[in-house]
Amino acid sequence: MGIRKYKPTTPGRRGASVSDFAEITRSTPEKSLVRPLHGKGGRNAHGRITTRHKGGGHKRAYRVIDFRRHDKDGVNAKVAHIEYDPNRTANIALLHYLDGEKRYIIAPQGLKQGDVIESGANADIKPGNNLPLRNIPAGTVIHAVELRPGGGAKLARSAGVSIQLLGKEGTYAALRMPSGEIRRVDVRCRATVGEVGNAEQSNINWGKAGRMRWKGKRPTVRGVVMNPVDHPHGGGEGKTSGGRHPVSPWGKPEGRTRKPNKPSDKLIVRRRRTGKKR
């Protein structure tokens, strides 16, 4: 993937860039693997906003991605196309299995149209192949990793990210996450070899607020510029700093969104670096 920069013909185009989509081989998705996607605009069943800054955006169709692949062990698949997916940062690959079935997977770096990949304990260690962690050698770069055996890929699915398999001891494998955290995972969990493709996606400069609106992201207004009725930081004469520790519009302290006693925390060997003073 490359990035194409625009000439500054308008203020919105100045500094803006876009993917050149050089890896994409087809522009329309496989019809049998597409489902309707209805935007909720951040509202719950009562119509109240539960997630702010969401709404609008271009109409999308959901591409059904195979995050398990365990039921296709031993069946080779040919990469028919590399496609764009508006619902994620990574590209997706359309696989044609020898038994006639078609499925989408996350497209790893280096996977090309015409490549043949497989899944199963005896699969080769090459990008796109899916194996249990117990069958992957230490030091291998992987992505789309399960947290529970058979639960489907949960980790490292975004563009350009990867996990390194550090080693195996007993029934657990040690993984270095993209955040730097080292975590133990059951060796029966499956992973796909290679790193996720479309790595340059993080370098795209969106250029203008309108492109964010196309993605369904609404403006984020600071509390200190609101009125007292709208936010605890609002009001004051002239510009003020809020006069209190940062809080949400409902008065809850900012941050601290993680559950302090998660059962899976016991599997963390080394925590990620946050840059915060403890």
From Swiss-Prot:
Lineage: Bacteria, Bacillati, Actinomycetota, Actinomycetes, Mycobacteriales
SUPFAM superfamilies: Nucleic acid-binding proteins, Translation proteins SH3-like domain
Gene Ontology annotations for the cellular component aspect, listed alphabetically: large ribosomal subunit
Entry's family note: Belongs to the universal ribosomal protein uL2 family.
Protein name: Large ribosomal subunit protein uL2
Alphabetized UniProt keyword annotations: Ribonucleoprotein, Ribosomal protein, RNA-binding, rRNA-binding
GO biological process, one term: cytoplasmic translation
Self-association and partners: Part of the 50S ribosomal subunit. Forms a bridge to the 30S subunit in the 70S ribosome.
Chain intervals with Basic and acidic residues compositional bias: 253-268
Listed Basic residues bias regions: 37-58, 269-278
Annotated spans, Disordered: 1-20, 25-58, 223-278
Gene3D superfamilies according to UniProt: 2.30.30.30, Nucleic acid-binding proteins, Ribosomal protein L2, domain 3
Protein task: One of the primary rRNA binding proteins. Required for association of the 30S and 50S subunits to form the 70S ribosome, for tRNA binding and peptide bond formation. It has been suggested to have peptidyltransferase activity; this is somewhat controversial. Makes several contacts with the 16S rRNA in the 70S ribosome.
Keyword Ribonucleoprotein listed: yes
Molecular functions (GO terms): rRNA binding; structural constituent of ribosome; transferase activity
Organism domain of life: Bacteria
